Amino acid sequence: MSAEAVKKLSFEIAPSEEESEATIEQQDVACGLENLPVSLWPLGAGPRPKPFQYTPDHVAGPGVDMDPTQITFPGCACIKTPCVPGTCSCLRHESNYNDNLCLRDVGSEAKYAKPVFECNVLCQCGEHCRNRVVQSGLQFLLQVFQTEKKGWGLRTLEYIPKGRFVCEYAGEVLGFSEVQRRIHLQTAHDPNYIIALREHTYNGQVMETFVDPTYIGNIGRFLNHSCEPNLLMIPVRIDSMVPKLALFAAKDILPGEELSYDYSGRFLNQISSKDKERIDCGQPRKPCYCGAQSCATFLPYDSSLYGPLENPGTS
């Protein structure tokens, strides 16, 4: 589809004259909790997403050791000078964003391993600091819409430049035992919203964060998987070590394009020998309908979440 055709689409899905302002307000999927409304398509009577409690930020769920709403990081003392590497305590390595608020070095996979820390509420720099991107919330008009095969999806109504922040993947932060419990309760027809983030530190340790927006979450829960995604998930820390799962544009995105990311956290949907053994033993894979040329034909699979249930006291 050409750029002109996509832009035309973005105008065609605007509300009709018959739609009242009250009706349009009711269609805000974000319930007024984001700084921009998130529309729903189609308007009027018809299918609607399954109800859930909206939250723009993480909330503490069962079994989690650290409350994601607590502020544990100290703030910087940049009052008279801008936050720059070398003087700002929040920027120990290099600047996270350029002058256009784009994530630096998108497209260089080696850069993804570097931690991203933003300034927080205790910092002296103020709300206009360039190191406050993810915490500023939505910057582009987005829309939840019904796809042909993938259920509900999320698309942009505006042009999004490569490197810009798009949205978070927010929900309940869970302990591992609770994650396993919820996974084991799922049927083959239930969608799985739980994401497992694993960060490997320099000393060989692995930091795990489990987020589930099934019951409490934000618009990130509507993002579908793609084997050739246009979004990249980056852990961004602001107030504490509990990371925000921030999604940035991996390339320029045109109006009307569906937003997607790789559920495996990579750009290649590969399967390990351990996962293959478990699948061969009867654990089914869900088909992938992304339509990409490199489509792996199935959704990513994390075998560690399907093991024997742990004792709740060990989470």
UniProtKB/Swiss-Prot annotation:
Pre-SET domain ranges (all copies): 74-137
Residue ranges constituting the Post-SET domain according to the UniProt record: 284-300
One GO BP: negative regulation of chromosome organization
Record's keyword annotation contains Ribonucleoprotein: no
Keyword presence, Methyltransferase: yes
Keywords: Chromatin regulator, Chromosome, Metal-binding, Methyltransferase, Nucleus, S-adenosyl-L-methionine, Transferase, Zinc
Binding site for S-adenosyl-L-methionine: 150-152, 193, 221, 224-225
SET domain mapped to chain residues: 140-264
Top-level lineage group: Eukaryota
Stored SUPFAM superfamilies: SET domain
Binding site for Zn(2+) 2: 76, 90, 119, 123
Functional description taken from the UniProt entry: Histone methyltransferase that methylates 'Lys-4' and 'Lys-36' of histone H3, 2 specific tags for epigenetic transcriptional activation. Specifically mediates dimethylation of H3 'Lys-36'.
Protein name: Histone-lysine N-methyltransferase SETMAR
Organism of origin: Rattus norvegicus (Rat)
